């Protein structure tokens, strides 16, 4: 598939793609609309690198956006393929990679389409802050599982569907502190860890860990936490 064509898979909300595409030009601005994501990125990277030797690993970053995590993993030696359905974001990611001299294979492609082409090709797949933005997150997980080699690792992050998550990630972050643009998140699409665990089992993946991720807006820092009420990370393995 040409890396700039519209994907065949329809597992996306066009309104979501448009919303994030509008942020493309400031994706790499650490003080811009994606400021919290910049704070979360080192935590995500540490979570992955603690469980996977990135040097030489073939890694797929699903829903890569402007390439924050993709570039970070490539800097640690991973051979990264990164996909997103928003052409504007992929363009920004490619340009930033050129400016930073970091090599990542960026594509406008769905994970479902890629799974049909490259089954069992990757040592690891990352899918961060994406599942809560698609109509069928279970299809994303199944496609990620297909793309993994036996023994391959899947890393996920998402938002829990709890009153705390609604208060902090929606009301607090979008309407009070205005850390994120309004409409970034939809509470009904948040995912409980038990739901995620069931989806992983159905995809024949073994859940190994669930860890909370705490964002401290007053310091603009994030860290791992034992509390999973708002943001959390998960790690699963393909037998």
Swiss-Prot record:
S-adenosyl-L-methionine binds at residues 44, 63, 84, 128. It catalyses: a 3-demethylubiquinol + S-adenosyl-L-methionine = a ubiquinol + S-adenosyl-L-homocysteine + H(+); a 3-(all-trans-polyprenyl)benzene-1,2-diol + S-adenosyl-L-methionine = a 2-methoxy-6-(all-trans-polyprenyl)phenol + S-adenosyl-L-homocysteine + H(+). Keywords: Methyltransferase, S-adenosyl-L-methionine, Transferase, Ubiquinone biosynthesis. Pathway: Cofactor biosynthesis; ubiquinone biosynthesis. The keyword Chaperone does not apply. GO terms for biological process: methylation. Signal peptide: none annotated. The keyword ATP-binding does not apply. GO terms for molecular function: 2-polyprenyl-6-hydroxyphenol methylase activity; 3-demethylubiquinol 3-O-methyltransferase activity; polyprenyldihydroxybenzoate methyltransferase activity. CDD domains: AdoMet_MTases (cd02440). Its EC number is 2.1.1.222, 2.1.1.64. Belongs to the methyltransferase superfamily. UbiG/COQ3 family. O-methyltransferase that catalyzes the 2 O-methylation steps in the ubiquinone biosynthetic pathway. This is Ubiquinone biosynthesis O-methyltransferase. It comes from Xanthomonas oryzae pv. oryzae (strain KACC10331 / KXO85). The gene is ubiG.
């Amino acid at each position: 598939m040409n890396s700039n064509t519209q994907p065949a898979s329809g597992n996306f909300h066009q309104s979501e793609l448009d919303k994030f595409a509008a942020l493309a030009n400031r994706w790499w601005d650490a003080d811009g609309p994606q400021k919290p994501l910049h704070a979360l990125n080192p935590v995500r990277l540490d979570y992955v690198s603690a469980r996977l030797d990135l040097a030489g690993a073939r890694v797929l970053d699903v829903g890569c956006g402007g390439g924050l995590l993709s570039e970070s993993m490539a800097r640690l030696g991973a051979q990264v393929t990164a996909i997103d359905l928003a052409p504007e974001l992929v363009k920004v990611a490619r340009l930033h990679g050129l400016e930073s001299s970091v090599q990542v294979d960026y594509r406008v492609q769905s994970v479902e389409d890629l799974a049909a082409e490259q089954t069992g090709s990757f040592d690891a797949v990352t899918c961060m802050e994406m599942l809560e933005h698609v109509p069928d997150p279970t299809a994303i997980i199944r496609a990620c599982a297909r793309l993994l080699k036996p023994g391959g690792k899947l890393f996920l992050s998402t938002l829990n569907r709890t009153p705390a998550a609604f208060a902090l990630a929606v009301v607090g972050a979008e309407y009070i502190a205005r850390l994120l643009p309004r409409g970034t998140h939809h509470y009904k699409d948040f995912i409980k860890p038990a739901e995620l665990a069931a989806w992983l089992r159905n995809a024949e993946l073994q859940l190994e860990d669930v860890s909370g991720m705490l964002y401290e807006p007053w310091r603009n820092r994030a860290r791992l936490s034992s509390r999973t009420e708002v943001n959390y990370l998960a790690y699963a393995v393909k037998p």
